[in-house]
Amino acid sequence: MGQCGITSSKTVLVFLNLIFWGAAGILCYVGAYVFITYDDYDHFFEDVYTLIPAVVIIAVGALLFIIGLIGCCATIRESRCGLATFVIILLLVFVTEVVVVVLGYVYRAKVENEVDRSIQKVYKTYNGTNPDAASRAIDYVQRQLHCCGIHNYSDWENTDWFKETKNQSVPLSCCRETASNCNGSLAHPSDLYAEGCEALVVKKLQEIMMHVIWAALAFAAIQLLGMLCACIVLCRRSRDPAYELLITGGTYA
């Protein structure tokens, strides 16, 4: 019965180590996705510390690949030292992922205030020229999120760009995709996106942070199972002389 439990634990442990390799790739992808998306929205969110969970999640992903390798070798070879190292590293990574989850929730709560403060500045500096990074960021967000202005398209009337152009129109990025003849004129509001960008940017950034949180939680649960199986094998190996002889190839006298 005990040997059956050991075999089952070892089988699950080897399978989990294979999952760790897949998890390593997924975590690195999630972290990279956060970096790429942040680059598109960085003008609306000035707190670079928001990227800390993404940096940690990429580091955890790289470490999980190494953990999977150590775990497979230690499990197959029945190495007590290897399994102990495996459990300790898994525990450290588990704690790190808990920290990622906490940081994720902290920064997710800060998103709304950060965006509200930053988006006002960005819209005020809009000048409609392609070389200007802030202007490109606004046009990109309005096209991607199908929005116009901070709260709605009327916000453009309070910008310096609108007052300087004096043509009673908003940027072409405010035009609906279905409005083929749209020139941004406020005289044809039905051609413009009605929803403001602030709420949608906040929603997008919070969704990104939730991807990090859920990824960390999911793989933390898998790591708990891995630690449990490794501990079962370790404890059985330490307490059962017969099992020790079976591993080393010895026999009873």
Swiss-Prot record:
Keywords, comma-separated and alphabetical: Glycoprotein, Membrane, Transmembrane, Transmembrane helix
Gene3D superfamilies according to UniProt: Tetraspanin (1.10.1450.10)
Glycosylation sites: N127, N152, N167, N183
Transmembrane residue ranges: 12-32, 51-71, 86-106, 213-233
Topological domains, Extracellular: 33-50, 107-212
InterPro entries noted in UniProt: Tetraspanin/Peripherin (IPR018499), Tetraspanin_animals (IPR000301), Tetraspanin_CS (IPR018503), Tetraspanin_EC2_sf (IPR008952)
Entry's localization field: Membrane
Keyword check for Phosphoprotein: no
Topology, Cytoplasmic side: 1-11, 72-85, 234-253
UniProt GO cellular component terms: extracellular exosome; plasma membrane
CDD domains cross-referenced by the UniProt entry: TM4SF8_like_LEL
Membrane topology: Multi-pass membrane protein
Membrane among keywords: yes
A family per Pfam: Tetraspanin
Subunit details: Interacts with claudin-11/CLDN11 and integrins.
Function noted in UniProt: Regulates the proliferation and migration of oligodendrocytes, a process essential for normal myelination and repair.
Similarity field: Belongs to the tetraspanin (TM4SF) family.
Protein name: Tetraspanin-3
Species whose genome carries this gene: Homo sapiens
Lineage: Eukaryota, Metazoa, Chordata, Craniata, Vertebrata
Gene name per UniProt: TSPAN3
